[in-house]
Each structure stands twice: as C-alpha cells, then as structure tokens.
Swiss-Prot record:
The lineage of its organism: Bacteria, Pseudomonadati, Thermodesulfobacteriota, Desulfovibrionia, Desulfovibrionales. Homodimer. Heterotetramer of two MnmE and two MnmG subunits. SUPFAM superfamilies: FAD/NAD(P)-binding domain. The gene is mnmG. It comes from Nitratidesulfovibrio vulgaris (strain ATCC 29579 / DSM 644 / CCUG 34227 / NCIMB 8303 / VKM B-1760 / Hildenborough). NAD(+) binds at residues 278-292. It is found in: Cytoplasm. This is tRNA uridine 5-carboxymethylaminomethyl modification enzyme MnmG.
C-alpha cells in the first residue's frame, strides 16, 4: 500500500483506474499528466506494469500503435526504449506501410521504470487493494468499493482488469483461481458488472514455460542478432539505453509432436475443462499440432528475459499441457534437450465484456461514467491494451473538461481501427491487431505517427513543451526537405550525365526535379547527394519520411481520395437515442443490430455486418426528416 500524492488524497477523484497493467498505467499517467486527480487501484503494487506473457513490445501493427501512443504523449514507447534489449525492424525489405519495430524487453527493467514514473507522477495516487464493486448513484458510476472495505469516490471509473476477472489458471487437468501465476483474481467485480447490465463472456489465453538460461545449448540454434544501430520507438526520448542481446531460433520436430499428442487426453482444452475461446492468432502448441498435422515443425524463438535474468522465454510453444508433458516436449527440441523448466506454461480463463456494449469513447452504454479498456474488451496484447487505456483516458479528460470527444478516424490511427472494430463488430475471441485490418494502411505508417497525432495530443494537453518543440523542429525540417526536392532542378549537362552513369541510371533528356529522380525505383535519397550535398544534413527519420512521401506520392494521393469520398458518411452523426423501430424500410434484423451497436456515425453503421446500402439510405432519409422537424 503506497500513497504518494501530496497533500492528502481528495475526497473525490476525477477518475479511478482499476488495474495497473498496460492499459491502466497508460491511462493513469495520461490523466494525471493532464491535471486530473487520479487513483490507480491495483491488487499488487509490486507488479505495476508487469509483462505477464512474452518479454517483448511491438511487432506488426503493434509497433505502429506504440508509435501512435508516443505521438499523442503516452508512455509505452519511452518505457520500452529504456528497457529494450533487442530492437529489430520487421518487414524491412517490404513497403513502408508494413514495416514495424519490435523490441525484446528486460522484464525487470521495464517494471522498474514503469513503477518509478507511476510513483513519481503528481496528481496520481496508488492504492493496493482489490475492487469488489462499482458504486452507482443517480444513474452513473460514482466510485469503487474494495476488499479492504474502502469506498473511493470519483466522477469516472475506468476498468482495466486484464485477465483478472474471475481468472482461473490451468496446468493439465489441475486448475485454480488466479489473475496470472502468482497473483489472486478479482472475484467480486464480475457480479457487480452484471448487476449494472453488462453481458460478460469467457476468453482464454496462454503462456509458455520459462527455461533456465544456463541449461540451454545455444550452439544448436540459429542466432538472430539485433539491428545495429537500434531504432527506438519514441520520437521524443533519448533512445535505446541498454546493451543489445541476440535471440535464438530453433524448431520443434516429429518427436516433439509425438510427446504433445501423448498428452492430449490430459489437455484442459481437448477434454472440455476450458470453456473460454482462445486466441486464433496465438494458438497453443498443442492446438497447432492438432490443427496442422501435416506440418513437420514449428518455429521456436528463444528470447532472453533480461540482461541479468536467469530465465529465457521459448516463444512459440504456449501450452496448458501437464507439467510432465511439457518436460517431455521441451527435451525433444534441439538446444533444449537438457533445459530446466523454472515456471510451467499455463492457460488462463477470464471474464470479458463484449465491446459492442461500449460507446466509441470506450464508455459503457449501460452506465455513464464507467469505462472499459484493455483485455476486458476482448483484446490480446500489451500494445492493444495500452492504446485503449490512452484512448479511454483522453475521452475521460475530454468529458471532465466539456470538450468534444477524442475520436480519430480509421484513416488517422491504428488505435482508431482497433476501437472501431471492437465497438462496431464486437468479438467472441481475443482480438489482435494486424496491418491488414486497416483499409488505409499506407497512410498509417510507423514513421508518420507524429505527423498524424501529435497536434491532437498537444490540443488535448498531453504533449508537453519539449515534445512539441521536437515535433515542430522535425516537421519544419521535413517541409524544407520536400520543398528542396520538388524545386531543386537538375539539367542533363555533362556533369549530371556522369553522375547518372555512376549510379547505373540513364540520364534524363530534359531538366527534372530531384523529386522526379528520387521516384526512380532503384534510387534512394542518399543517392542524390552528388546532385545536392544538402541532403546529408537532414536527420535519418526526416529523410526516410521524405523519401516515402515522394516515392509513394501517387498511391498516397489515391488513398486520400478514398478517404475524402467516405468523409461525408463518417461526418454524419447518428443520435444516440435514435428509435430505429420507427424507420420505414429497415428489416427486423437490421433494427436489432443498429439498436445493439448504436453507431456513432453513418460510416460506422455501414461497417456493421448485415447493414445494407438500402438501409443506409433509409437512415439518411430519416436524418433529413429529423432535420426538417
């Protein structure tokens, strides 16, 4: 139990954040930094910001969201840079839309830096306790009651409970209550949410056994080195600080699969003990072996847990098989024949709320002042959770200050795609973000997250003066470079022809701009230095973004045209209390779907499964009638 707020805590908080995982930490920091009195309630103050599963942040689409969090003024990118021990750019040989940053994280270092910043943050108080129920007064959330018998009052309550709601851990046919291994679950809150009117379901996720590093033979594995130099997540931080380590790659084999099949009769998944739906895109190793019997091997990434940690994380073999089966399976994998298990792999079942019960702000429709973010909304992943935590916090702040809500469009942020998918379509399985979910992904590159979102973060009060100055300087440099590339012209004289010859390129027959030259597929911005030495004075991130804008200008223009075409529907707001039952031309099925989702805009209505173009026309006609009245 710790209190750090001075003077003494208020009788009324602006917001209580329940849960100190990635959603909760991001939300609590944002609210406090924007000046709101915030209480962070956690069952274990020693594990604030703990990486419960794999020690990594980022990846495809996930790295994009970390950059977006940073661009808005959030914390995950800064924390990951400070604790990262291997940075790699994924899809580096592919187009800029799908390139993504992924970092191995020192688990202990990450926890230390998160706790340091949480406990040092003004306006933020930490209290170790378990939330038992939501206080409801005058039709809205008014606070939280805890297991210690405390009542904390607040204008808003944000639940970021992760896997803790009625959490149950499974190892083989043994199971016991737990929010994660070593932590108690939240047992009372689910009943309170049901009493409020929320429908809860059951999901499942899992993790791998942890292995003793000194018992692993890395010489039998392929080395996966870090990038040199490492590329940090944060636009505004000091960069990567810790020494960088390699990861290693090995594979399962038929002997591994035989050991796994031998344990199917004791698998809680295959025997029906686990009822919750698991993650489609992060299946257990037993699920992979059962579903893909034709595959002779599955990849295993052996990842360090930290610079000084004695443990490694064998990414790719999450399992809930009995411990003796886990041991037999591990012993068949090259390099792991003598590996000792420090902690077993396990599955965890937990309650979640189908997110169609939320407004686009992540406030519940059932109760004003109650907000949900993270795995409670059916998502998987640290990054998805942190993005929702920040999204909810910004909207709580907007509500407190009577400002318009923070609702960027699907063409502006991956986190907007995430939230829109959740509240429009709901989910019956753990939702994971992919670049393929974004229809405008060329506009949503990692390297332009600041250009897309930092002005918004500044307007909302989360981007501080230092961050704003760094962004403004970079933006000015980018505009300067783009102007030079478009306006600086090259005439095909003898000197220019000689440069083109050395580049292996045909010389132009008439004067061209540097931008025209850069659009040639085989040339990059550094190749232009012989024509203009000034290109070398710009920072790498500025040059990279300028090159992307120039080379992909035609594609970017077409994407912007598509966005402009859909803007009318996205800007047409539907009243929250609209009575769909009285609108002529709507089928009963469509009325039910619209009534359940209650879309914020006509564009969101169009994304609801089964809502036809004819139904959208009916909605537009109804809106015109309402306007005439």
């Amino acid at each position: 139990m710790s209190t750090i707020r001075k003077p003494s805590p208020p009788d009324m908080y602006d917001c209580i954040v329940v849960g100190a995982g990635h959603a909760g930490c991001e939300a609590a920091m944002a609210l406090a930094r924007m000046g709101h009195a915030t209480l962070l309630l956690t069952g274990n103050a020693d594990r604030i910001g703990h990486l419960s599963c794999n020690p990594a942040i980022g990846g495809l689409a996930k790295g994009h969201m970390v950059k977006e969090i940073d661009a808005l003024g959030g914390m995950m990118g800064l924390w990951a840079d400070e604790a990262g021990i291997q940075f790699r750019t994924l899809n580096s040989s592919k187009g800029p839309a799908v390139r993504a940053t992924r970092a191995q994280i020192d688990r202990d270092a990450y926890l230390r830096v998160v706790r340091r910043d949480i406990f040092a943050q003004p306006n933020l108080r930490v209290w170790q306790d378990m939330a038992e129920s939501i206080i409801v007064e005058e039709g809205r959330a008014a606070g939280v009651r805890t297991a210690y018998g405390q009542e904390f009052r607040a204008h808003h309550v944000l639940l970021t409970t992760g896997t803790f709601l009625q959490g149950r851990i499974h190892v083989g046919l043994s199971n016991f209550p737990g929010g994660r291994l070593g932590d108690a679950p939240a047992t009372g809150l689910s009943a309170s949410l049901r009493a409020i009117g929320l429908e809860l379901g059951r999901l499942k996720t899992g993790t791998t056994p942890r292995l003793l590093r000194d018992s692993i033979d890395f010489s039998m594995m392929e080395v996966q080195p870090p990038d040199d130099p490492p590329r940090p997540f944060s636009f505004r931080g000091p960069g990567v600080r810790l020494p960088q380590l390699p990861c290693h790659v090995t594979w399962t084999n038929e002997r591994t699969h035989e050991a796994i099949r031998a344990g199917f009769d004791r698998s809680p998944m295959f025997t029906g003990v686990i009822k919750g739906t698991g993650a489609r895109y992060c299946p257990s190793i037993e699920d992979k072996v059962a579903r893909f019997p034709e595959k002779e091997r599955h990849q295993v990434f052996v990842e360090p847990e930290g610079l000084e940690s004695p443990e490694c994380y064998p990414n790719g073999i999450p399992t809930s098989l009995p411990l003796e089966v886990q041991k037999a399976m591990i012993a068949t994998i090259p390099g792991l024949e003598n590996a000792q298990i420090v902690r077993p792999g396990y599955a965890i079942e937990y309650d979640y709320a189908d997110p169609v019960q939320l407004r686009s702000t992540l406030e519940t429709k059932a109760l004003r002042g109650l907000w949900l973010a993270g795995q409670i909304n059916g998502t998987s992943g640290y990054e998805e959770a942190a993005a929702q935590g920040l999204w909810a916090a910004l909207n709580v702040s907007c509500t407190l200050r009577s400002m318009p809500p923070f609702l960027p469009g699907r063409d502006t942020a991956y986190m907007a795609v995430l939230v829109d998918d959740l509240v429009t379509k709901g989910t019956r399985e753990p939702y994971r973000m992919f670049t393929s979910r974004a229809e405008h992904r060329l506009l949503l590159r990692e390297n332009n997250a600041d250009a897309r979102l930092t002005e918004t973060g500044r307007a909302l009060g989360l981007v501080d003066d230092t961050h704003w100055q760094l962004f403004s300087t970079k933006r000015a440099a980018l505009h300067s470079l783009l102007d030079e590339l478009e306006n600086r012209r090259i005439t095909p004289d003898a000197a220019a022809r000689d440069i083109f010859s050395r580049l292996g390129e045909p010389a132009p027959t008439k004067g061209v701009s540097l931008a025209d030259i850069l659009r040639r597929p085989s040339l990059t911005l550094p190749d232009l230095a012989p024509f203009w030495e000034g290109v070398t004075r710009f920072a790498d991130d500025v040059r990279e973004e300028a090159e992307t804008i120039v080379k992909y200008s035609g594609y970017l223009a077409r994407q912007q045209e598509l966005v402009a075409r859909s803007a009318r529907m996205e800007d047409t707001v539907l009243p929250e209390d609209m009575d769909y039952t009285v609108i002529p031309g709507l089928t009963r099925e469509i009325v039910e779907k619209l009534g359940k989702v209650r879309p914020h805009t006509l564009g969101q209505a169009a994304r609801i499964s089964g809502v036809t173009p004819a139904a959208l026309t009916c909605l537009e006609i109804q809106l015109r009638k309402m306007g005439q009245r």
